[in-house]
Every structure is written in C-alpha cells, then in structure tokens.
Curated annotation (Swiss-Prot):
The lineage of its organism: Eukaryota, Viridiplantae, Streptophyta, Embryophyta, Tracheophyta. The keyword Glycosyltransferase does not apply. Ubiquitously expressed throughout development in germinating seeds, cotyledons, leaves and roots of young seedlings and adult plants, stems and inflorescence. InterPro entries: 3'-5'_exonuclease_dom, 3-5_Exonuclease_domain, RNaseH-like_sf, RNaseH_sf. This is Protein RISC-INTERACTING CLEARING 3'-5' EXORIBONUCLEASE 1. Pfam families: DNA_pol_A_exo1. 3'-to-5' exoribonuclease (RNase) specifically targeting single-stranded RNAs. Triggers miRNA accumulation in RNA-induced silencing complex (RISC), composed of miRNAs and AGO proteins, by degrading uridylated cleavage fragments. Required during plant growth and development. Residues 35-66, 102-127, 166-173 are annotated as: Oligomerization. It comes from Arabidopsis thaliana. GO terms for cellular component: cytoplasm; cytosol; plant-type vacuole. Changing residue 52 to A: Normal oligomerization but impaired exoribonuclease activity. Pleiotropic developmental defects including spoon-shaped cotyledons, twisted true leaves and infertile flowers associated with reduced miRNAs and trans-acting siRNA levels. The gene is RICE1. Homohexamer with DnaQ-like exonuclease fold in a ring-shaped structure with a central cavity. Component of AGO1 and AGO10-centered RNA-induced silencing complexes (RISC). Interacts with and acts as a cofactor of AGO1 and AGO10.
Amino acid sequence: MASFDGQGFMMVDNSWVQTKAIDVESTTDISPYLSKILEDSVWNGNRSIVFDVYWDVKSVSTKSEWRLCSVKFSTKNFCLFLRLPNPFCDNLKDLYRFFASKFVTFVGVQIQEDLALLKENHGIVIRSSLEIGKLAAKARGTPIVEFLGTRELAHKILWYDMSRLDSIQSKWDEASSNDRLEAAAIEGWLIFNVYDQLQQ
C-alpha cells in the first residue's frame, strides 16, 4: 500500500491533508499513489480529484514549446505532487490511464488551455473534466466568478481564512520546498471544498 509519508498540513477547519512529493524516474512505480488518490476520491463520496499541471516553456525560433513538468492531484485527505522526467518514461503509462479514468471527474481552475496542451503535446486525454469556475458562475449566477483564480474563487465561495496561503505566496521566491508543498496542499483542498459546496 502506498504511504503518503510526506509532510502533513492542518487546514483552516482543523482537518489534515497528508502529502507526498515524488521525483518520477524510469523505475518509479507511481500506480500505488494514484490508486490511493482514486480510492480517497471514491470514499469521500463525490468522486472528484482536483488537479493542476505545471509547464516548462521553451522558445524555439518564433514559437513556444510547452512540456508538462509536474502534476498535482488533491482529494479531501491527500495531495500528490509528481515531478515528471524529461523525456517521459514508459512508467508514465499509469498516469495516462489515470487521466483517462471514467470513474472520477478531474476538477481544475482555468483548465481549458491545459486540457488542449495535454492532448496536443503529450497525447493525454482526460475523459471527464470540470472547470470549477464555470460551475461556480452558473451556480451563483455571477458570471465574473468563472474568471477567478484559485485563491479568489475559494474566498468568494467559502469565505475561509486565507492568511497562511497569502503568507506563503507573498514570499514565493524565498519559500522553502516545504512551504510550496503546503501551498499546493492548501490550494487543492480549497478547490475540493469549493466543488463539495457547489454540489450541495
């Protein structure tokens, strides 16, 4: 069984999010961690996994090349951060299969361009995805909500104390890897809770 043995972080409602950050190499088996994320999404009832992707951008002559360099998956209790190799290895087939799952919905903020880049640049197809901003705008009857980022959207819907996230982000360049992991966990947890709130 996969162990999320990274740092754990307390959220503003006193719940706990356990993390795991992995530098994926050709011999790394990520499938147990993906299974744990999937299992937690099912046990928490809404079958959603919050995801975020991070890109390396390289300019070649007059155009930019985008390469997926890391991905984050969050559920109610876990945050998994995968730093991906360049070039991709065969063991990332598990990641492709995970994204193609029809049993869960991958939820994200401002993900339309990411979905297109994943497909165009890496052949990754997400079968079931949800742009949380669009759902929030429709549910609240406030079109502008669709264009908010993670922090602003979560604040608008949940009204949670954002001081810890703000503190980390205000000093991002000096932030430790542990602080950055905490920010990733907080953001994933916030969007999970926004989705949960909008479904009620």
